[in-house]
């Protein structure tokens, strides 16, 4: 199973670690941590996460595309057309598109939640609806192949 996990400056480490740890128990699990370029990316708590791949050299056909949240850093990333374009491209080919917390906003900006029900931090529900998603108050929302 090939998982692409977006890492970005200021992201909430907990949002990524929980899902990635759970997936690591699956057979044939592989993960690529992606950002503009390989290297250390500092999270919200100051702990560095290693981006193993750039957008250009990441898998084109992941089983799972995953995005965690990060409050203001997530909002800042909404204006990064390269990152949003990467999510749109890989998400259109992924078997599953997944997010935690405000990561749903990034999926929404990439057009990946249009017409889907999706969970997001309660403070971002109105913003999520602007991307054509139907915000859900569920803590975990599954709509077809979208898990938020």
Label each residue range with its predicted role.
Residues 113-140:
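A conserved active-site-flanking secondary-structure segment within enzyme catalytic domains
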Residues 145-148:
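Conserved anion/nucleotide-ligand pocket segment
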Residues 1-97, 104-108, 134-137, 141-143:
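Extended, subdomain-level signal for the structured scaffold at the beginning of enzyme domains
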Residues 70, 102-103, 112, 123:
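Beta-hairpin (beta-strand-turn-beta-strand) motif
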Residues 97-98, 118:
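A short beta-strand/loop micro-motif in the catalytic core of glycosyltransferases
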